[in-house]
Amino acid sequence: MKSKLIAAVILAIIIAAFAASRFISFKQQKPVETVAPKPQVTIGIILPLSGREGAVGKGLQAAARLAIDDLPKHRLKNEYNFIFKDDEFEPKNTIAAFTRLQHADRANAVITYSAQSGSVINTLAENGKIIQFNVGSAEPAVAKGRYNFVHWTHPDESTREILDHFRRNGFQKVAVITPKISEALAAENAFRQNLPRYPEITAKYYRAKPQEKDFRMLLSFIRNYEPDVILALVSTSRASDIIFQYRASKLPYPLTNVASFGRLDTFAGGEDMFFSDVAPARQELIKRMLSSQPDISTFGAGNIYDAVMLLVEAFEDAPSPQQAVGALEAQRYYEGMAGRAEQDAEGVFHAPSVLKQIKNGRAEIEK
């Protein structure tokens, strides 16, 4: 009987000790810290990944992916989701891609390529309060409105570059060919505004239809004018046409261009021609792109890389994603893969311009 009593007392002591230890352990246990989820920011990137501008679009996509890979994700306050869309360089597809990004993906911003794409969604972006950051457009109207921005070489820089070339070579009479399209007219307007700085140079202007493919008649008129040099402000889609028709005409005056020759898939027929172009990306970015894809286009690579970085920086600096447009507006200068760019009052980040010459089938920067 006594042994049973002792056993019961020992069991009670053990149970009490176990309960006390559990209570103390519970009291000492730290509360579980809950980490608030990061705000979500979605950025759509609409590019021509197929179609006639597909080669350029794939190069831009590769540069954008490198920018995304380079983001210091562990230090960012927002969670970023990047969505690529192929518009095949067709305006209706650009609108459809933007609409899906706006309503299905709830995009906070989009990156677009070219004046064509930037123009067709300019109003949609403005009304939807979605930031559009365009690369590849020299048309100032693409940046119209508070929510529209451009990162590219402005016609003011590119036309001064070509005028400097004319001066160095003693070209005093210039024949300017301008199709009636907004981007070409903007380049001509910049050329006219810069011309007074070069009093020794005069120009005569020749208009072409918006989608003109046959420039032979204009070239015959130019032969009668006998200029020192021809400046063709044609679009990329018509650049090959005028190059081959110029060669066939055997005109003795050099053919030059602003920007569009740089977008050609091939420089066949353009040997020795000069053109001003957007400055290339820094060598470190170009080397990374070419290391995995030796034949990839690097056209505009620095611009789209910097557009990704500028957008992320704006969203990081803003108190909320909805206020990122104000942070982007406040960015006056940016030193990036495209060099030093300055933002003007219209939302255009002016990238540098360079002079290039076609040599051995490649466009090389003229030193």
Where are the regions a protein language model picked out?
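Extracytosolic ligand-binding ectodomains
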Residues: K2-K367
